[in-house]
Amino acid sequence: MKYDSLADLVLEAEKQNLPLCKLVLKDQSEASETDETVLFENMKRSLTVMRDSVETGLDGQKRSASGLTGGDAFKMNEAVKANKNICGKIFGNAMVKALAVSQTNACMGRIVAAPTAGSCGILPAALLTISEDRNIPDDEVVMSLFTASAVGLVIANKASIAGAEGGCQAECGAASAMAASALVELCGGTPKQSEHACAIALKNILGLVCDPVAGLVEIPCIKRNAMGVANAFVAAELALAGVESAIPADEVIYAMKKIGEAMSPALKETAEGGLAATPTGKKLCEKVFGHC
């Protein structure tokens, strides 16, 4: 399969009466001439790294090498455990995990780029949160990663997953779309509903710029991961309820590509615009590097 159209993937899944994850695993096995069991075990290792990166990021004492960030996941976790958060248990735990993984990345810890390091907290936060809440077996979570990967590959092929090309909409947007699609499948949705979840999640983040303070993947990147996982749950919830995207996923992806092309280079990972160019952003840059 070419992985250049989500609609085509869904059509093929429906034709073969398979969930997206099994279609993708079967195709990848044939394309790479590798046994499905081997591919599954490889993906399972990624899930293990994701889970470990959550635990690492919950350490309230760790700060990034720059000193700009650290401890937010710990603070959020304490609020959730004390039942002081306003968004409920699932949203609270998802935000905790997204912050934790992103913080692990900022501290140079081991993470899974899903699809990028800058958006690494969104997918694991979504899948680990729902699996814990619903007692979903790890094997099912691993399979959902194949669905997420296929969605990410379509976005990469049709547009981009790089902030330097498409802004943060390409990174956190892609991750949120991947997570939403996988959430739908984990919760018993159809391939078509996964497609709608992808479209809804991505169009909610269209236009989001990449403006890292001091050029580091910390401010505002870490908190944007919390936003991205919340958006994934919103999109999945809507899709599972039967809400459909008026604009097909493939067209939303293309729109994201065109928006990225229209963005100023100052808003695509160069740290020359947006939050990076604010007075405070510049002061933080000087604090880290001595100049800005």
Predicted segments, located by residue:
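Generic N-terminal targeting/processing segments that precede catalytic cores or assembly contacts
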Residues: 1-109, 133, 242, 249-292
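Alpha-helical support elements that line or immediately flank enzyme active sites
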Residues: 124-135, 180-188
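Functionally critical mobile loop/hinge segments
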Residues: 185-292
